[in-house]
From Swiss-Prot:
Domain of life: Bacteria
Lineage of the organism: Bacteria, Pseudomonadati, Pseudomonadota, Gammaproteobacteria, Enterobacterales
All residue ranges annotated as the BPL/LPL catalytic domain in the record: 29-216
Gene3D superfamilies for the chain: Bira Bifunctional Protein, Domain 2, CO dehydrogenase flavoprotein, C-terminal domain
GO cellular component terms, A-Z: cytosol
Listed InterPro entries: aa-tRNA-synth_II/BPL/LPL, BPL_LPL_catalytic, Lipoate_ligase_A, Lipoate_protein_ligase_C, LipoylTrfase_LipoateP_Ligase
Binding annotation for ATP: 71, 76-79, 134
Positions with a binding annotation for (R)-lipoate: 134
Name used for this protein in its record: Lipoate-protein ligase A
Pfam families assigned: Lip_prot_lig_C, LplA-B_cat
Cellular localisation: Cytoplasm
UniProt KW keywords: ATP-binding, Cytoplasm, Ligase, Nucleotide-binding
PANTHER family cross-referenced by the UniProt entry: LIPOATE-PROTEIN LIGASE, LIPOYLTRANSFERASE 1, MITOCHONDRIAL
Length: 338
């Protein structure tokens, strides 16, 4: 029986693909070597310890229907579209070695006619007239008996969109998470015009087979039916949940301030695990009572636009004469925390 396993996803759903990856990683025998090939439609993927409100322009993402996906490995935030080819290599210990998987990807690129080299801890770069340009970034995860290396190859990504979603608004965040480092990047199509995703996958597959001296049939993972993987439904539910993608953010503080016709407002939030643990309101409004009441209502509230808006509007019952002010406040808060 072959020690290799090759899986190719037909899904462009980042939560689906990351759930497949997680299930395979948890249940694979320690003697198996796995290659999983996949790609995502418009998504910002953040590292396990990152704060999405700090790393991403979450409001712009919502407007453009760009998903947020938190992965189980560390590292920084990246934008995925269908111009990215994603790969995951898995192996048991002590065999797991990220230099092996890196060399497999480099061999695949070489077979396609691209000379690339490893740079730093997790990048692959090509030399151009303008200097080194990144074409691949990776992240890693290890447990006591296994490890994986996953990454992306920039094939024909819309690089102009990176700044749309990875340059956050200038929010006053005092975050305890990790800030991403932006790199100078280029697409492989600059070197190999017109090369399709399927050809890149084939090159990686052949390099994988060549390294291990074995071949195996590909397993196609389809979104049309639930994959036959242990605990897939539960893993997908977690991967796609707000609690995982947003709620796992490191603790942070957020200061919002705005001036309205009826007075200035400052809101100070401390947020842990996606919940407001402390809310303070400061205002020079002539009628501060509804704002003082709001501070109490927001304690323990999910740090989510719709929930904050709901708490604002609930105050209309107790403060009907301040309806105009409360509705203005509600609209502003909902926009500011996205």
């Amino acid at each position: 029986m072959s020690t290799l396993r090759l899986l190719i996803s037909d899904s462009y759903d980042p939560w689906f693909n990351l759930a497949v990856e997680e299930c395979i990683f948890r249940q694979m025998p320690a003697t198996q070597r796995v290659l999983f090939l996949w790609r995502n439609a418009d998504t910002v993927v953040i590292g396990r310890a990152q704060n999405p409100w700090k790393e991403c322009n979450t409001r712009r993402m919502e407007e453009d229907n760009v998903r947020l996906a938190r992965r189980s490995s560390g590292g920084g935030a990246v934008f995925h579209d269908l111009g990215n080819t994603c790969f995951t290599f898995m192996a048991g210990k002590p065999e797991y070695d990220k230099t092996i998987s890196t060399s497999i990807v480099l061999n695949a690129l070489n077979a396609l006619g691209v000379s690339a080299e490893a740079s730093g801890r997790n990048d692959l770069v090509v030399k151009t007239a303008e200097g080194d340009r990144k074409v691949s970034g990776s992240a890693y995860r290890e447990t006591k008996d296994r490890g994986f290396h996953h990454g992306t190859l920039l094939l024909n990504a819309d690089l102009s969109r990176l700044a749309n979603y990875l340059n956050p608004d200038k929010k006053k965040l005092a975050a305890k998470g990790i800030t991403s480092v932006r790199s100078r990047v280029t697409n492989l199509t600059e070197l190999l015009p017109g090369i399709p995703h399927e050809q890149v996958c084939e090159a990686i597959t052949e390099a994988f087979f060549a390294h291990y001296g074995e071949r195996v049939e590909a397993e196609i993972i389809s979104p049309d039916k639930t994959p036959d993987l242990p605990n897939f439904a539960e893993t997908f539910a977690r991967q796609s949940s707000w609690e995982w993608n947003f709620g796992q953010a490191p603790a942070f503080s957020h200061l919002l301030d705005e001036r309205f016709s009826w007075g200035g407002v400052e809101l100070h939030f401390d947020v842990e695990k996606g919940h407001i643990t402390r809310a303070q309101v400061f205002t020079d409004s002539l009628n501060p009572a509804p704002l003082e009441a709001l501070a109490g209502r927001l304690q323990g509230c999910l740090y989510r636009a719709d929930m904050l808006q709901q708490e604002c509007e609930a105050l209309l019952v107790d403060f009907p004469d301040q309806e105009k002010e409360l509705r203005e406040l509600s609209t502003w808060i909902a926009g500011a925390v996205r």
